[in-house]
A protein has these predicted regions:
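S-adenosylmethionine
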Residues: 1-189
């Protein structure tokens, strides 16, 4: 919201940071050098954030409009949430829900750094429809226009980077399926 992609590329170039446009993603750039992202010019001021291009697809597929109300379940650390808010031009309301209070804190920090006041974050059990309704009421949001759910998964698609996942067994996967089903059921009510 604060800086165009072209202006950010110019700023990074001036700081001798190698970066380029990511084709097919209107806001994305790939940074090839420069050290810690948090130390790059503009990061602390909220000029940009870091998100994998694949995660950005969620925002484009959801195609949120300014003024809409969105419920984002399992939202931490908040990358998809803030991208949705940016696509909405900061106009509307997003309730970002996560079970763990410390992870909700990450969402709040992320939204604050990016100056996205349309994001409200709540530590709520997303599998409980009654608790979700209470959370929606707390932020004066009725029925959301859209629901985003990035449900916990087995992570087996990341075996190359996370070899410890090889120890997953059928019981672990069944447990995840039940959790995913509970989240979907609660989101629909």
């Amino acid at each position: 919201l604060e800086v165009s992609r072209e202006d950010l590329l110019d700023s990074l170039d001036a700081a001798e940071v190698s970066a380029e446009v990511v084709e097919g993603f209107p806001e994305a750039i790939a940074i090839h050098s420069g050290g810690a992202v948090t130390a790059l010019p503009g990061f602390s001021e909220g000029a940009f954030t870091v998100q994998d291009p694949a995660a950005q697809l969620i925002g484009y597929l959801a195609a949120p409009k300014a003024g809409q109300h969105i419920l984002d379940l399992c939202a931490a650390p908040g990358g998809k949430t803030t991208h949705l808010a940016e696509l909405m031009g900061g106009q509307g309301k997003i309730l970002a829900v996560d079970l763990h209070p410390h992870r909700v804190g990450l969402i709040k920090q992320h939204a604050k750094r990016l100056n996205l006041s349309c994001i409200k974050a709540d530590a709520t059990d997303g599998t409980d429809p009654q608790l979700l309704r209470v959370a929606l009421e707390r932020v004066s949001m009725g029925q959301p226009d859209a629901i985003i759910l990035d449900a916990p998964c087995s992570g087996l698609g990341t075996l190359r980077r996370n070899p410890e996942l090889r120890s997953k067994n059928r019981a672990d996967v069944r447990e995840l399926v039940e959790l995913q089903r509970s989240l979907l059921d609660a989101a629909q009510t």
